[in-house]
Amino acid sequence: MLRVSIAFIATIFLFSGCADKVATPLTHNLDKKEGIYSIKQAKSINMQELVNQVEHYPVIFVGDHHNTEKTHKFFAEFINELGKKGYNLNLANEWFTPSQDELLKEYTDNKFNTETFKKKVDRDKFSKYKREYVSSLYEAIKNNSGRLYGMNISKEDRAKISLREFDKMSQEEKYFYDNLDLNVTAHKQLIYPYLKHCDKMPQTTLESCFDRMYRVQVTWDTYMAQNTSKIANKVIKTPKDKLLVFAGALHIEQNLGIPLRFSRLSNLPFISISNEKIENDKDLKIDTNKADFAYIYESVEERSK
């Protein structure tokens, strides 16, 4: 009887102890060195190894750190190395909308140069980020006989959804709005910490700032995923065809933004690449679910500290 009692108490202690433990995120703890890290393999790799490892993936999601020169140079080099392997390259970019596809085709068809392209696009109306960084990507695609595609929603259409201006929406836009999935809890956990600025903003509508801004994030991800699927159906025909999807890292990481919604529309295999910035005052830790690969870089500002 005593043995049974002891065993019973031990069992209770064991399971209650497990219940009290809080799971901590799993990370790869690394030395602060620039380079490419394969999260899938838990090891550093070089550019050629990265190119070889994406061979069987027709869709490649790339997370961008805006206004960061090094990450754009890395991606431009990646594009050029893929070109050397004879891949047919297509780049879908969040800085353009599908309505600009004809203009993008004229650019890649060499009907005008990059300077003229900048003037025609008037990208400053669409983004405040430095266009000279992303221009290297467009040039790399053009130089490798590739194609550029727009995939983002326009500011005007996004505003209708943000402000719930149903009277201004077409039937197609209303259908899009009604079918936004705002209930992916893991995605909310990822995004909400970045919406803290809502606490400081004046309440202008009955709806909370958090809810409105989160709906905008889901709108971006859903719209870009839908266009990624359309473009993929159009351009992925042979093992040599690649679709590179370039958007802000928060749209790509953890496979919870564009990739999640893309996977609901397409069975094409995909792989993801993101970035990790080295910071002087923090250990270098990469979340195991961040992406399949991470480009680790040190900014000029951090190096000078």
Predicted segment positions?
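Zymogen propeptides
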Residues: 42-43, 47-84
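N- or domain-start disorder-to-order transition segments that initiate the globular core
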Residues: 4, 18-57
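C-terminal regions of proteins
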Residues: 23-25, 138, 223-244, 249-305
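Beta-strand elements within well-structured catalytic alpha/beta cores of enzymes
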Residues: 57-65, 90-91, 141, 242-247
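Short internal beta-strands
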Residues: 90-96, 272-275
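A substrate-binding/cap region within the structured catalytic cores of diverse enzymes
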Residues: 89-90, 101-231
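Bacterial N-terminal signal peptides
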Residues: 7-15
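Solvent-exposed loop/turn segments at secondary-structure junctions
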Residues: 65-68, 96-100, 154-158, 249-252, ...
